[in-house]
């Protein structure tokens, strides 16, 4: 017999600096910051996608420094479109070419404030095999490849139909990272502060950094939308 030493994701309280069992977690309504973020495509078998953007949505902006991949649904239909008109308050830019799930087109346009588009191409997720992107923080030291991977946990309930994957922050993300030999980075210390893996955000607390992350994304022309969502969120019973 052989021994195996590895790791697994656990729920963690940054206040008590301890792991939590499922039975110790209570769920309460919580208002989270939400963001839509652009990832620039550097390599793809879909030639129209190269040098354009894949759009992701997340309720945890603080996990962006931990991003190492994007995930798509193999049998989901995606579209590539060019933005032609936006409303006055939108952060989206006319002329940008963006990829999202076809079924979520209307909800994405309404939320972001896009009023007119031209669809350039439609395709199934399975055609995204071997696609790669830059990290949105590439210009501030995140100079590694972000792989675009197939995953069975991608749904069309909300967002863009593409999931941002941070292998150090959740079970689905971690398992996908292990399966695809991703760099499993945990950029957060036991007390909830960023470590050296988070580059310019070192020392910032993840509970307080969402707007700072969003502002940096906006500065780098990667932020398309900043909003809020009330949803059920885990809390320590202590």
Map each language-model feature to its residues:
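Residue patterns forming the tRNA-binding/recognition surfaces of aminoacyl-tRNA synthetases
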Residues: 2-65, 79, 84-89, 127-133, ...
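Carboxylate/His-rich catalytic cores and anion/metal-binding grooves
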Residues: 78-80, 87-135
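C-terminal accessory/binding modules appended to enzymatic or scaffolding proteins
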Residues: 147-149
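Glycine-rich, acidic and aromatic/proline-enriched surface loops and short helix-turn segments
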Residues: 138
